[in-house]
Amino acid sequence: TAVLTRTGDYFIPLQERRRIARYQHKADIFISVHADAAENRSAKGASVFALSLKGAGTATSRFARMLAERENRSDLIGGAAIEAGDDTLRNVLADMVVAGSLDHSLHMGRNILDRFTGLTHLHSKHVEQAGFAVLKEPGMVSLLVETGFISNPEEEEKLTDKQHQRDLAKAIFEGVL
């Protein structure tokens, strides 16, 4: 059963999104689906990201690092406060638990990219990794899927098309199976 962590266009802090999936819905898999944006209006293509266990500042590409930094800052923009007691030790322990589900995340990400092939342009043909805060739920298979660049007029047209949305959703669903 798939469930949404939100039903409209409003902000939910990154940690709360994970809590909703894990504790309200007892999810085994967490997929954060986005439409990307870039200053360069010719940027295009879908991407799939998994967590990097090498630390918040490391990533498999410059693009992955920049995207993770931007996504992780969304809590600051959304007004979420850093929780009391956040420290390096908690992050290290969480990273250790997350490592167990990373292989499954990478496998599932490759499956999704395979199903996107022919459906949409791929920005990256392999699963990228970076320190996305939204993916740091210990023990949960998790991915961030960028469905394309809404800042690109051609992709915006596709991303707002209901049939294309259904096709992307089906590709993600089949990639999970």
Where on the chain are the PLM-derived regions?
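Active-site-proximal helix/loop segments of hydrolytic enzymes
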Residues: 1-177
